[in-house]
Amino acid sequence: MSSAPFDLRVPAARRSGWRVKSASIAICVAVTVLFAAAPGFSQSESEQGQGRAVVTVLPKQEGALPPSVTGQDLSVKVNGKQARVTSWKPFQSPENSLELVLLIDDSARSALGGQFDSIKSFVKSLPPNTKTAIAYMQNGSAIFSGPLSADHAVVLRGLHLPGGFPGSSASPYFCLSDLAKHWPSADREARREVVMVTDGIDPYHMEYDPDDPYLQAAIADSVRARLVVYSIYWQGMGNASSSSYENNAGQSLLAEVTEATGGKSFWIGMGNPVSFQPFLAELTRRFRNQYELGFVSSLNGKPQIESMKLKLSTPGTEVDSPGQVMVYPAASAQK
């Protein structure tokens, strides 16, 4: 006697229930993917980064009153993406401390002594909230002649003629990296600014190469240390007979550093300037017209250096901002 075949079909009611559950699961998955991918939704704290930068805003017309600039006048992009301005305040309070290092190439020609009166007048004019020190580029290091101090007499005791030996600084970019890594203060709230007096020629890369590894290391170290770097061109011993190509290469390398950090390079042609006084006067004006920018941007987890572009809509102004900034995860942002 043959038995009836076993019916593998599922009752219609049960099949209907499965379809409902499957549809529900599919909808949930689709919504989850949509929310995760949609750019309009706010980032989590782990996806946000924060950073700070020193920005200089000057009136285009010399002698004009300082411009009135608010955070609404700014457009900031970090790594090519729009960033949100979280703070914008001028450094105009006596509590806004400034730390300044004059970093002099020890291979500079001894005629630099003719600029000492201008340097002394500049240091003596600095306000009480400014601590200054003088360091010399020697064998790839920044060698301080005294401590950071608001006492002008203490600072100027460290001013002396450079050694004037060809190549004694090694590379000026080694020395800047060393200064950035061993900044002589732990005050994270102070502005940190550097004035390099050098020809900028890297003896290990005599040509202009923006990818010079020593240059790029100096820029990265300066950005991490939040330095604003300026340079005053002054020829070194052994480089006086350098070709115009090599001198121009040195100036161009210095410009790479100053533009990346929000500073400025000063030079007049290929020779030494007659006087530092106009350059130092502009530095004083810049220190008086600086702002602290705070921003929030996207970040892929770990602290990293990002490119930054800042535009200012205030008419009659010019702005210098760093081309690179350090961005930290929002939850552990560095001050």
Kindly give the residue locations of the regions a language model identified:
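Low-complexity, intrinsically disordered/propeptide-like segments
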Residues: 9-14, 37-38, 68
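Bacterial N-terminal signal peptides
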Residues: 23-37
